[in-house]
Amino acid sequence: MQQTVLTSSGAPGAPAIVVRSFEAEGPAPAQASIVIGPAMGVRQDFYAGFAQWLAGQGFRVSTFDYRGVGASLDALGRNSPRGVQADLTDWAQDYEAVVTHARQALPGAPLYLLGHSLGAQLPGFFRHPEQVDGLVSVAAGSGYWRDNAPRLKRTVLYFWHVLVPLATRLCGYFPGRRLRKVGDLPAGVILQWRRWCLDPRYSVGAEGAAAEQSYARVRFPVLALSITDDELMTARGTRNLLALYPNAPQRIDPIAPADVQVRRIGHFGLFRSQFAGTLWPCTIDSLRALATLPAATAARVPPTTA
């Protein structure tokens, strides 16, 4: 594993993005490059075992931390994201900088995104989506609060209307680790995410026509793995996320715990080592299936509102 520090702009003094690269193992050239887009508040360390396993299957894999999170925060010499200037648009630029770096490292091979939750939402803001050959989304959906899973929905309005504004104002960032909610986040990130999650059309509704046009530029195929016992997302939320990508060939594949003879998978489970012999190989099947998604399926997932 090799660690690199990037900046999204390349300019001196720009925020650090710490990237870890796992080179494909074995004598054969890498089959493809994979960039794992992390979920909100999740450090890249969480994906390390899965990334190493993918490298063992012949893929070059990149993981990273958005600015103000994990190793990227450590690179700033800070112990909290207080004062870190970042929002979700900046995070999309960070993500795309990692994609560009991965493309340059392996220019002749396909490049796929494996987006966990937020990691499947932000590619709609890429300035150059043509760099990407496909996206497998994992446990991802619209974050609109009415699309949340039933148990989460019971408390989420308190979270957005009381806890987030109050805690962020008091601390100068969102102290999610202390509150056991999401994770520590820069103020600009959590407050923009709040706007998205309170809008029925999520990011596109909150950001307007420019965001809608940006998502419409995405032409790469999207295959969504929808976890049926996800404690945060719902199938409707997944459908609504895919509806934001109107010109992308797309498909939803549900995964239930019974499919792999376990009691629970949940929002984070697919990346845990207990599924190395079951769900991890399924992700490779999903990556290979991207090329088979016909363009005729694009924009065929109708948006829903409630």
Residue ranges and their predicted role:
Residues 1-26:
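N-terminal cap/lid segment of alpha/beta-hydrolase-fold proteins
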Residues 36-42:
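Active-site glycine-rich loops that stabilize anionic/oxyanionic intermediates
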Residues 44-80:
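Conserved alpha/beta-hydrolase
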Residues 83-104:
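Alpha/beta-hydrolase active-site loop
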Residues 114-201:
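Alpha/beta-hydrolase-fold enzymes
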Residues 218, 224-226:
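Short beta-strand/loop motif that positions the catalytic acidic residue
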Residues 233-244:
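Short alpha-helix in the alpha/beta-hydrolase fold that links the catalytic acid
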Residues 253-306:
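Catalytic active-site module of serine/aspartate enzymes centered on a nucleophile-bearing elbow/loop
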